[in-house]
Amino acid sequence: MCKKLLVSALGLILVFSVSAQERKKFIDRQMTDRFREHTGTVLDSRFLEQDMYEVALDRELVASYDTVCTYRVSHNQVTDQMKSGRCWLFSTLNILREEMIREYDMGHFEFSQTHGMFWDILEKSNRFLENVIDYRKKPIDARINAWLFRKPIGDGGHFANAAHIIEKYGVVPQEIMPERFSSLDNKWLMNLVRTSLRRYGLKLRDADAKDLQSIKETALSDIYSILVHNLGHPPTEFEWSLKDKEGNVISTKTYTPQSFRQEFIKHDLENDYVIFMNDPTKPYYRMYRVENSRNCYEYADWTFLNVPMDDILTMGVESLKNNSMFYFSADTDASMLMMGGIYDVALYDLGKRYGVSLDMTKEEMIRSLEIKSAHAIAMTGVELDADGKPVKWLVENSFGKVRGWDGYVVMQNEWLKTYLFRFTVERRFVPEKLLPLLERKPRVLKTWNPTY
C-alpha cells in the first residue's frame, strides 16, 4: 500500500513538473491570475497621475550635488548646439578654445561650428558617393547598399571627424561664420542633402565608368550650393582682432582659416591625441577600426584601443590635474536629471518601486542595445576622495545655460563607469604600457555595428 502511494505521489510530482515546464506561446487566464497575485494591491497611486520619474526621483540625492572639484580646468561660458547633432564638433572645439582663452586671457570666444559643419557635410557627401561607386556592382538591396541609401549621411560624428576637418580646412572665429537658422536646427537641411545624394547615387549606379567623376562632381556642386544658401560662404580670408577679456586689442591681422588654425591651435590633432573605447563586449587591449566612419575620404577610419574603465579614469584624472580637458561620449539619456544637470545611477529606483528587477551589467546593456553612445561632451573637472579616487566629474555641456549650473553638469563616478563609451585624451597622459598597443593592426568592425 505504501509503495503504491509512493509511486502515485512520484507520478503526480512528475506530471506537475512536466506541466510546470510546459511552453505556452500565448497569454491565458492562469497567467494573468498569477501576474495579478504577484503584483499585489498596495500600489503608489502617484504613478497613476504623474510622470514615473518625477515620483521615483531621489530628491535628497539631488540636493546633495554641487560643482565642487579637486581639479577644474574651464570656467568658460557654455556653447549651444541647439537642435543639431553637432555635439562631437562642439566638444572638440570647446577643448581647443579653452587653451586659447587661457593663453591670451580672453573673454568669451567660440570657434565657428558652422564652418566645421559646412565642410563636414560636403566631405560626408563625397564619401557617400565614393561608397556608391565602390559598391555599385552589388544589388541595391545588398546589406551595404541598403545601409548607404537608408541614411546617406548624418550630422553626428566623433573626435577624429573633427580633427580631419580642422586639419584640412582650418578654423575661423564664430563671428566670421556665425550660426544660421539651418545650423541651429538642421533637420530640413540634412533631409534635403540626403535627397540629393540618393538621386545622384542612383545615377552613379547606372552610369558608365567614364562618367562617374563628372556625375560625382555635379552632385557635390549641388550640395555645395545647398550649403551656401543655408549656411553662407565659407571665408577664404578675413580680418580679425584678438582681444583680452577687458576688450583691449592685442593684435589685428588678416587670416586664412589655415593660418588662423596654425596660430591659435597648438596641437597636431592627428598625433597629439589618442582615442579609446570602453566596450566590455569585446576583448580589452585590442585595436579596432570602424568601417566607413571617416568623413574625409582620404583620411583613416575611426580607430581606437578598447580598454577597461579603470585605465580611462586614471588617464582622465591625470589630464585634468594637468589643466587639460578631455573629450568623451556617453549615453546621456540614461539615469539623468536633464534640466538639473545631474547624472547618477541611483537617481530613480523604479525597480524597487515596482517590485521588479531592472539590473543589467554594462556588457548586457550594450549587447541588448539598451544603451548607446548618444552625446559627446568635454570633461573639465573632477572631485577626488581622501584616497585620490574620483567621486564625481564636472562636464562642460553644449546645450546652453539652462541645464545644470549655467550649462555645466555633474556626473557621478559610477554613472560614468557605466555609461561612458568613447574617450579621447592627450597622448602625454597615456600610460607607457598602452603605447605599444596603439601600433597593432586593428580589427575591422562592420559599418552597421550598432555600438559605433
Task: Show where each model-derived region lies.
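N-terminal regions that are enriched for targeting/export leaders
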Residues: E22-Q77
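Papain-like cysteine protease catalytic cores
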Residues: Q113-S241
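Coil residues (strongly favoring Ser/Thr
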Residues: S8, A20, S45, T67, ...
